[in-house]
Amino acid sequence: MVNPSKLKVDSVADVIAAAKAEPGKIDIAHAGVGNPFHLAAVLFQQAAGVKLNEIPYRGAAPAVQDVLAGIVPMMFVDYATARSHIASGALKALGVAALEERKELPGVPPIAATPDLAGFEAWPWQGIVAPAKTPPEIIAKLRETYVAAVSDPVVRQKLIEAGTEPMQSTPQEFSDYRRKEAAKWADAVKKAGIALD
């Protein structure tokens, strides 16, 4: 998202063009080193081949406040945090870090639709896990209960309103996805030289 009064861009491609014109000069806020919003910004810079000036904050709330105030022009942030600011027009959503357009942000394209950013995804995910030696029949029962819960229209709608899209993968699919994500993020962190203080 961006503060439209501070950064005159209409698309992710515009951000990339501006960043290439002035490497390291455009500020981007994040909610602290290693935070998902920070890592999304890192992955974006790597994928787009640009350098932004990262401004760390102690959490999303103060970062969003400074983007609203125009102190920093943009940041990656979750939908639940940005929803009211986007709805009011104070902030502009340029793209979503999911592979497809999100129902809660109609008309906002996925960043992956930007030329040269196919496959870009930095969407936070959550999952339900159990101890490694949990019997398969218990895992099956847990999954059955979970699927029933997220299939309930009221529960599903509440999750979507909070910016979470409930998925119903199998335990193996989720395990494969977690491994793929862990490798992607480990590579991004290593390339960026990120270390916690």
Residue ranges and their predicted role:
Residues 1-62, 111-113, 125-158:
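Hinge/capping helix and adjacent helix->loop/strand transition within the periplasmic-binding protein
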Residues 17, 69, 113, 122, ...:
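Phosphate-coordinating loops and pocket residues in cytosolic domains that bind phosphorylated ligands
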Residues 22-26, 50, 68-77, 90-93, ...:
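Alpha-to-beta junction loops
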Residues 28, 54, 76, 93-94, ...:
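Generic preference for hydrophobic
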Residues 32-33, 55-65, 69, 78-81, ...:
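Short helix-initiation/N-cap motifs at beta->coil->alpha
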Residues 41, 67-68, 89, 142:
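Hydrophobic residues within well-ordered alpha-helices
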Residues 46-50, 87-88, 136-197:
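An extracytoplasmic/periplasmic, membrane-proximal ligand-sensing/linker region
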Residues 82-151, 183:
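C-terminal lobe and pocket-closing loops
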